[in-house]
């Protein structure tokens, strides 16, 4: 399965939880896919699992420093800083 196949499969998925399961299975087979970690992080964020989302963004950045996870991580930090400064302390 390619990352494009994964994206196509996710188009028919309605819940974040189901998407997380599918992406996690993909990551198990492709542990170096920064894009998959970024996608799962976004689904975790949507499901309310902020710390898991941040961990996935950081993993994606470790795999590929040029990853778009930088944008997701920055947006997450800004949201957390705005909503509750005690929740995230760099």
What are these regions (language model features)?
Residues 3, 34-35, 67-68:
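Helix-start (N-cap) detector for alpha-helical repeat units in TPR-like alpha-solenoids
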Residues 31, 64-65:
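Short coil turns that delineate tetratricopeptide repeat
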């Amino acid at each position: 399965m390619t990352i494009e196949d994964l994206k196509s499969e996710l188009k028919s998925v309605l819940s974040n939880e189901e998407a997380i399961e599918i992406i996690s299975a993909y990551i198990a087979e492709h542990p170096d896919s920064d894009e998959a970690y970024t996608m799962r992080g976004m689904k975790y964020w949507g499901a309310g699992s902020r710390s898991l989302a941040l961990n996935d963004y950081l993993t994606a950045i470790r795999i590929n420093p040029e990853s778009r996870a930088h944008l997701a991580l920055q947006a997450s930090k800004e949201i957390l800083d705005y909503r509750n400064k005690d929740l995230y302390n760099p």
